[in-house]
Amino acid sequence: MIVLLCVIFAFLVYSNWHSWLESLDRNPIRAYALTHKTRFTTNADIRETLSQKPALKGYFGQDIQDVKAKLLAISWVRDVVVRKVYPDRLSITLIEHNPVAVWNDVNFLSEQGIVFSLPPDRIDKTGFPMLYGPDTEGKVVLEAWSKIKADLKARNLDLSSVSVDNRGSWTITLSNNVELRLGRGEWTPKIDRFVTIFPEIDVPEGKKLAYVDLRYEHGAAVGFSPLPK
């Protein structure tokens, strides 16, 4: 009998507690506050994201991980910290990707080599390195950019873009728009070869040097294009 009474008492306590929580949780979370100023994310972005289904629940019923997953779906958001504030608010900390290069003309690369997108009106692409390749190779291309740029700087040359194709063949473009086709494998000896032969290249009148193909074991092939009129 005592055991039965204890069970009944526990059930009543649980039921009343659950009903009390439900009464407190009738109103959904309706407001948020950012803990710091963001570079790219607007209030409209957050409102639109939080309004997506499933709808927000009340303070006790809302799963923080669900809110975090919604916000992480924003392409330029790298990480999120979300905290519930009673009775109906969220405290949100957004960590955004920092763009360090333009990727395939339309997207950006972060410092970690992660590909992400930004609305065109949020950032000016001018001055960013231009990098190209499969999205899975973002980190590799970014590291190559840093190494090749330093290598060229030691030779008084400046780098404009780096590209790798699906076969792992590399092409770089100098700031004077000359394209160096490096192919696969180690690029340092190929750049050395270019530096050696560059002064000896005889550019025809009315033409400019367009590319130097360094994929050969010895020597190189060169191509020219008309000077702009």
Swiss-Prot record:
Mostly located where? membrane
One Pfam family cited in the UniProt record for this chain: POTRA_1
Q: Does the keyword section mention S-adenosyl-L-methionine?
A: no
Q: Which GO terms describe its cellular component?
A: cell division site; plasma membrane
Which segments constitute the POTRA domain?
Answer: 27-97
What's this protein's function?
Essential cell division protein. May link together the upstream cell division proteins, which are predominantly cytoplasmic, with the downstream cell division proteins, which are predominantly periplasmic. May control correct divisome assembly.
Q: Please name the HAMAP family in this protein's record.
A: FtsQ_subfam
Q: Which family does it belong to?
A: Belongs to the FtsQ/DivIB family. FtsQ subfamily.
Kindly provide the name given to this protein in its UniProt entry: Cell division protein FtsQ
Q: Which organism is it from?
A: Actinobacillus pleuropneumoniae serotype 3 (strain JL03)
